Amino acid sequence: MAGKARVHELAKELGVTSKELLATLKEQGEFVKSASSTVEAPVARRLREKFGSKSAPAPAKSAGNGATAAPATSATPATAAAAAAPAPAPAPQAPAKPAAPKPAAPQPVAPPQPAAAAPTPPPAASAPAPAPAPSAPAPSRPGPTPGPRPGPAPKPAPRTPRVGNNPFSTQQPVDRPIPRPQPRPGAPRPGTPRPGMSPNNMPPRPAGPRPGAPAGRPGGPRPGPGGRGPGGGGGRPGGPGGGGGGNYRGGGAGGGGGAGGAAAGGFRGRPGGGGRPGQRGGAAGAFGRPGGAPKRGRKSKRAKRAEYENMQAPVVGGVRLPHGNGETIRLARGASLSDFAEKINANPASLVQALFNLGEMVTATQSVNDETLELLGSEMNYVVQVVSPEDEDRELLESFDLSYGEDAGDEGDLEIRPPVVTVMGHVDHGKTRLLDTIRQANVREGEAGGITQHIGAYQVLTELDGNERLITFIDTPGHEAFTAMRARGAKATDIAILVVAADDGVMPQTVEAINHAQAADVPVVVAVNKIDKEGADPQKIRGQLTEYGLIPEEYGGDTMFVDISAKQGTNIDALLEAVLLTADASLDLRANPDMEAQGVAIEAHLDRGRGPVATVLIQRGTLRVGDSIVAGDAYGRVRRMVDEHGEDVEAAMPSRPVQVIGFTSVPGAGDNLLVVDEDRIARQIADRRSARKRNALAARSRKRISLEDLDSALKETSQLNLILKGDNAGTVEALEEALLGIQVDDEVELRVIDRGVGGVTETNVNLASASDAIIIGFNVRAEGKATELANREGVEIRYYSVIYQAIDEIESALKGMLKPVYEEKELGRAEIRAIFRSSKVGNIAGCLVQSGIMRRNAKARLLRDNVVVAENLTVSSLRREKEDVTEVRDGYECGLTLTYSDIKEGDVIETYELVEKART
């Protein structure tokens, strides 16, 4: 049939039920679901052959020539008419050539012979062949004698062809050899042409016919030159034999070749043994060797199963994604889905769809936080490893053949350097006063509110055992908002001095300083300060610090405790001696001064006249004027270096703190400083760090909107936008972290849209006007016409000099932005005793006030049998003895109307008012 047949159509045609046919198809490995499923043409042909052979009648032998009657189900009308001829005339025969084989009439054959045995063709046929059909006479041509046409043979049961000779087979002979089929009684002997070899009764083929191939003639094809008739006649002497079955392609069982010719040939168009000269024969299956025509047709079940197992695993929503085997994927902070897709060779759109199905709405180029990347990776069986900032920076420097944190050269190049000491402790415990006493200076008076809000770095010359020694001191803030500054100070130090007030004891920032020092693995010297004050108890301090692992030497520990008074200058020399002894005993303080300088930016600020200024502590190497430097995302060339006394420095050795002028922008506090060969390399490193920092900040600040809380996300929320300006980078960073840590309520949100170092400029005012933001100036003022522009645009600028004042006021502003919360306050209750109906105002309730007061325009609810009938009502009118009143007290009768008419006697009216409640 021209198109694909359906199962129920084939079942009706073959005379079986659809259920039986479905079972047969499933046994053969076909993918069918119901009686409406379609069946390919080769499968339908196989089914017709199978069920047709079962229902074919038994063959009946003819009395004259031994030919059998054709089966009624498959014989064509022309073949049936030829078989019914009573006295067929013998066909005219040309003289046979000596070398041509002479096929004999079909006769019963002996039991099957081995496959390797080559059967000998019998002499010329003595039985006459049936006459051809009148509609297509076969003219006699001079040439080889065509083989006789025996009568139609009984239709054989479908046999499995040999693998090597069947180009449509889906199996290979080396995998699963197929046994040779047994010969049938009345069939031609192997090696002889099969009777009735026409395209209508050829053996079944697993694959479909070639589209557009002409159908075979009824009665068999006309024999042509070279014996190209049914079964393949003899060829020319010395030439290749003819192939059988001109309408079939591929290497099948061909006819016998001529004497001295090639072996049995194949079908037309394929090298099958007896093809054109120069072509290789394809009889590999006959000799048990692999080869032959390429495999075609349907895939085997094993191939389909392997293909199914190798398919990409689907995830939620049916999106097909790569399925990993637990591989580790390294991604930078703030990576996008496009970066992830590039690592696993996937489509970014598929990752976007997969995240949407998981409840996250992210675009392909948007920075994604670490948790989302890890969640998506686990769905695809990947382990996502977000590269830490340290590893990321190390890989960046390695790409430029640079390294940080190691001394160049060998042991002979190292020289002794001064120790770096960080003074840490709780606020107001005397850290800056101790440094003032050591430096013989007054630093504390310059700090607003008497608390340190910067990191100061100083180098002090002291004397130990008659030898002058240098000590570098770093002063850190003690306020709770400066946690990041204390952590940076601990990382850049060799020894930590923990200052504890003898009259105050261990405080929260004291414990935090201990944790920073222990995390940085630096030794600690405890200075018990304010021993001159009343109530001072140094022994109590020693006992408290024992709980945190700082055990005094007099208690058998290894921590040195020194009782001092920074105000009186008591035991300051003993403290410095303890610092130097600890450095000599516990630390190897050496560095190579001859390499390119490396250090850390302690703090940075923007100076009006000098530009960006960074306080840098040199850790190794020597920094000179003119060096190309990079610190974080800032780069430049050293134009000038100044020490803590304001004097110019040409070269800064290890452990020397200096102020560096020449950066193009303000570096971040705690950024590593590195000297490179040229400005181009410094700019490239700074640009790549800036891009990474921007992506990481975008991923952190992106508010995750999931499908579950989409409704709440779409609700109107109050947002307070801030622009932060400060005198140095560390203070701005500390202020931002402190403000973002304020937790008020989900209804209000704090957002820092811009931050910077320096005074308030007109650009800041314009940005604040466009975004409805408030400008916070910390230790800075507005520049030029910025104040006039702010007044004209209505932009609020607030100035602060103490950090906790800014935190308190911003928190109060956030609380003021909260939506008000109302609390219900009951006013009174009244029982309806009578109902009066009026055509003007409706039902009037005559009530007796049982408790409280009834007030006009008050909120009310109607209760019936203690069940609320109506809510959110209003007392629209209130009368007492025909007079309008504003309220009626307990024990009096009144008449009132409600904004609800379905009232009954015995109902209770309860009035209340909503009082705004302060939110905290």
Curated annotation (Swiss-Prot):
Gene Ontology molecular function, alphabetical: GTP binding; GTPase activity; translation initiation factor activity
Span list, region G5: 565-567
InterPro entries on file: EF-G-like_DII (IPR053905), IF2_II (IPR044145), IF2_N (IPR006847), P-loop_NTPase (IPR027417), Small_GTP-bd (IPR005225), T_Tr_GTP-bd_dom (IPR000795), TF_IF2_bacterial-like (IPR000178), TIF_IF2 (IPR015760)
Region named G2: 450-454
Primary localization: cytoplasm
Region of interest: Disordered: 33-305
Keywords (A to Z) from UniProt: Cytoplasm, GTP-binding, Initiation factor, Nucleotide-binding, Protein biosynthesis
G1: annotated segments: 425-432
Binding site for GTP: 425-432, 475-479, 529-532
Disulfide-bond pairs as recorded: none
Basic residues composition-biased segments: 295-304
GO cellular component assignments: cytosol
Composition bias, Pro residues: 87-159, 179-193, 201-212
Residue segments, region G4: 529-532
One Pfam family of this chain: GTP_EFTU
Cellular compartments annotated: Cytoplasm
Extent of Gly residues compositional bias: 225-291
Entry keyword annotation includes Glycosyltransferase: no
Compositional bias (Low complexity): 53-86
Domain of life: Bacteria
Residue ranges of domain tr-type G in the record: 416-588
Renumbered residue ranges of the record's region G3: 475-478
Function noted in UniProt: One of the essential components for the initiation of protein synthesis. Protects formylmethionyl-tRNA from spontaneous hydrolysis and promotes its binding to the 30S ribosomal subunits. Also involved in the hydrolysis of GTP during the formation of the 70S ribosomal complex.
Alphabetical list of NCBIfam families matching this protein: IF-2, small_GTP
Family stated for the protein in its record: Belongs to the TRAFAC class translation factor GTPase superfamily. Classic translation factor GTPase family. IF-2 subfamily.
Protein name from the UniProt record: Translation initiation factor IF-2
Lineage: Bacteria, Bacillati, Actinomycetota, Actinomycetes, Mycobacteriales
